[in-house]
Structure formats: structure tokens, C-alpha cells
Design a protein with these regions (language model features):
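Rossmann-like dinucleotide-binding domain that binds NAD(P)(H)
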Residues: 97-186
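Single conserved hydrophobic/aromatic residue that forms the stacking wall/gate
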Residues: 1-8, 12-13
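Glycine-rich phosphate-binding loop signature in dinucleotide/nucleotide-binding domains
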Residues: 15-18, 94-95
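A structural signal for well-ordered alpha-helical segments within the folded catalytic domains
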Residues: 32-36, 84, 106-113
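Rossmann-like NAD(P)H-binding beta-loop-alpha module
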Residues: 81-99
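NAD(P)-dinucleotide binding in Rossmann-like oxidoreductases
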Residues: 167-214
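Beta-strand-loop-alpha-helix segment that lines the small-molecule cofactor/substrate pocket
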Residues: 12, 19-21, 27-79
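Short glycine-/small-residue-rich Rossmann-like dinucleotide-binding loops
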Residues: 26-27, 175
């Protein structure tokens, strides 16, 4: 009806249409297994994050890479316009060499991806992490499915973690379970460099005369 070809099996796709790559768009606990099924068929895979949920699964995926098979994992947060603009300023050196960042923008693997981007962490760089999850009473407002206006209060989790990288750079991850949708829990970002800092959408830095600019 709309010109999209449908098939009844993965084997039919491979043998009849010989795709350039397969897009894996399934629940996150199935991404790894489905990706490996297509890699086993010799098909390049494009998947979203997370590629896997544990180290054993990640190591299995890495073994495919070492054999020359390819999986591309799409991470979208670095491409958000405001984040992309912030990264551009930092990479241009406006605040100098970056030493630390406080990232409260996105959960788990998305947040860690942003930490690596803002600090310029090298692939494979070792780090030490310590973390703790707290629970605080919070007035409920919006969820993915509902809107609450009766003032109900529930315990909501907040995870705080410190990442210390072997380069000496440090990041603090801070994320509240209500943060994506609640109007009373807002995102925030702070990145410090030797010549200034970026806080949300403001940059404080020194010019060539070492005068402070905003």
C-alpha cells in the first residue's frame, strides 16, 4: 500500500535483498542478542544505545569487532543543538584545557557519553568510579503517561557518581529519576577549564588580556 517491502523471515531478507546493514530497534535488553544474530549473518548492524547491559555481553560484541564485523551504536545526545554548541565552544578552547565537569543532563549511558565528550576522555582510558543512590520525597507532576495535580508525594531516586580518570580529569554524574519530565527537576551542566567555565548556556572566560568576559 505504501511501497514498503515486507518479508516473513530474516533469512529471506539476507538471501533476497542482500541489505547493506540492519537497523536493530528493539527493547534495550534484547539489543545485544539481536545485533549478534545479524552480525553472525555477516550484516553490518546499526543499533541504539545501550549496545549491551553487562560486561560479558560487551566483550562478546567486541569479539565480533576483532573479527572484522561492524556494529555502529548511535548515541544522540551529543547531537542535541544546545549540547553540540557547548561542545563546539569547549573544543575551540575558549575555557582552556578542561579539568572537570558536573553533568546532570541524561541518565546512565547517555550521561556517561556526555562526560566523555565534555572532558575529551580518550577511548580505553582507565578510571575509578564511586557512586551512591539516594531517595528523596518529591511532588509528582508529569510522567510519560500521566499528569498529576493533586500534590501527591513519592520517593524518587537520585544517583550521584564520581569518575576519576587516569589523566587527572574528574566528572560528577548527577541524575534524578524525575528529571526528564518534571518541571521542578531541571537539567544542568558545569564544565571547568583552566581559563574559564561553562554553566548551562553561559560561558565565563578570560580574553587575551586576561580580562574576564561573559
Amino acid at each position: 500500500e505504501i511501497g514498503v517491502r515486507l518479508v516473513g523471515s530474516e533469512m529471506c531478507i539476507r538471501d533476497r535483498y542482500k541489505p547493506d546493514f540492519a537497523v536493530v530497534a528493539v527493547k534495550k535488553d534484547a539489543i545485544c542478542d539481536v545485533s549478534m544474530e545479524w552480525l553472525d549473518r555477516g550484516i553490518t548492524v546499526l543499533s541504539e544505545t545501550p549496545a549491551a547491559l553487562d560486561m560479558d555481553s560487551l566483550n562478546k560484541l567486541y569479539s565480533y569487532y576483532k573479527c572484522g564485523k561492524k556494529q555502529v551504536v548511535a548515541e544522540q545526545y551529543r547531537e542535541y543543538p544546545n549540547i553540540k554548541a557547548s561542545l563546539k565552544l569547549i573544543n575551540e578552547g575558549i575555557i582552556g584545557d578542561v579539568s572537570c565537569a558536573n553533568v546532570s543532563l541524561a541518565h546512565e549511558y547517555h550521561g556517561i557519553s556526555l562526560i566523555r565528550a565534555f572532558l575529551g576522555v580518550k577511548p580505553g582510558e582507565k578510571y575509578v568510579v564511586s557512586a551512591k543512590t539516594y531517595e528523596f520525597p518529591t511532588t509528582q507532576t508529569l510522567t510519560r503517561y500521566d499528569k498529576f495535580t493533586d500534590g501527591r508525594i513519592a520517593g524518587k531516586k537520585r544517583c550521584v557518581a564520581t569518575f576519576e580518570f587516569e589523566s587527572g580529569k574528574v566528572a560528577w554524574y548527577d541524575f534524578d529519576s524525575e528529571q526528564y519530565r518534571s518541571p521542578i527537576r531541571k537539567n544542568t551542566l558545569k564544565v571547568q577549564g583552566v581559563r574559564g567555565e561553562l554553566i548551562d548556556e553561559c560561558v565565563y572566560y578570560l580574553d587575551e588580556n586576561n580580562d574576564c568576559l561573559l
